Amino acid sequence: MSDKQIVVEGITKSFGTLPVVDGVSFDVRDGEFVAIVGPSGCGKSTLLNIIAGFERPDRGTVTIDGVRRTGPSRNGIMISQHGSVFPWLTVQENLMFGLRGTSQADNTELADRYIAMVGLAGFETAYPHELSGGMLKRVELARALVVKPEILYMDEPFSALDALMSLRMQNELRRILDEERHTVLLITHDVEEAIFLADRVLVLSPRPTAIQATFHVDLPHPRKLSSPQAQSLREAILKELGL
């Protein structure tokens, strides 16, 4: 059996007369972390929405685990820059909302385990308005992980946080991925974030977007962005972006 969990072939998308995605093809191995960077407005989020099943391409196909994607499925979860926590539910209730098919006691135990995993033990009964922005992002991450998705689709998940909290969340995500196996597709404007987290970085061209370059990040975790290898990779990616 192929280890290619996601296969994207010839994806093209326009909105009216505006071409946005132009023949994008790539694949993602099971358990691989792929980051996608590109100029603002180039079509990164549109491409991710197509892969996740929220948008239909004009041409091309997306195959997940050998099955052609025709819409969203429970094997993948989207985490975006926009908050998606239910404000009328507690932290624990937010995590339990998507759990089905097990007992209330089992759901509570599972929710509490993931709340602790993201460092929020003791805040189970807190409401979103009582939490900081960084804590809310931890709730979103825990709520995504508690349903045990095979794939995490992440659309600039930490971009609304301040620089220090963004770095903390990157470290938190990396720690969790060392404990649990997930395939990850990350959209980001932050080249250093891509290098810190990903196994591979795809650089997209301006709209209509296509894959302009691919970089393999052959650096062990935990990574030091100040290392000569990381700095060299950063410069190469920025050069592709015209910076």
Show the residue positions of the predicted features:
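Conserved ABC ATPase signature
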Residues: 127-131, 135
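ABC-type ATPase nucleotide-binding domains, specifically the catalytic core motifs of the NBD
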Residues: 16, 56, 89, 93-108, ...
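The feature captures the beta-strand-to-loop junction immediately N-terminal to the Walker
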Residues: 37-39
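Helix-to-loop junction immediately C-terminal to a conserved catalytic motif
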Residues: 52
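Conserved ABC ATPase "signature" region
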Residues: 105-123, 175
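A short, proline-enriched helix->beta-strand linker immediately N-terminal to the Walker B motif
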Residues: 146-150
